[in-house]
Every structure is written in C-alpha cells, then in structure tokens.
C-alpha cells in the first residue's frame, strides 16, 4: 500500500495520470532494450505479483519501477 500511495503522490504533484506513467515506462524500457512485457506485467500487478490488473503489484521489482519513474520525471524537470 505504501508503494501505491507514493505513486499516487507522484502523479498528483506532477499532474501525470497513472496510465501516462505506465506509458512512459514502456517507452523507456523499449529504448533500453529491456523486456518491457514482463517488466510492465510486474508493474501493474497482472504478472502474478498481486494487486490485481490495473493496480500496482507488490513485488520487490515494483521498487525499481518507482525509482525509474522518479528518474524520468526528474529528467523532464531539468530539461529546458
């Protein structure tokens, strides 16, 4: 639940919806050559990590996803 609340606070402070965050993560992983399908499956809870589809999963990998979102948002703020 803490992970979900932290994601929600990121979304509220930046005005970005959960769906656009997931979209940004998908584009980042495809550019870096990562396996975005399994990675996003863990991210939204549909890949067997709990939370139900559309929710944020409770796996340890979710922590990495939050860090990546923070980095992505930080890059946008520093740009221009």
Swiss-Prot record:
UniProt superkingdom: Eukaryota
Family of this protein: Belongs to the UPF0512 family.
Protein name, entry field: UPF0512 protein N
Organism: Dictyostelium discoideum
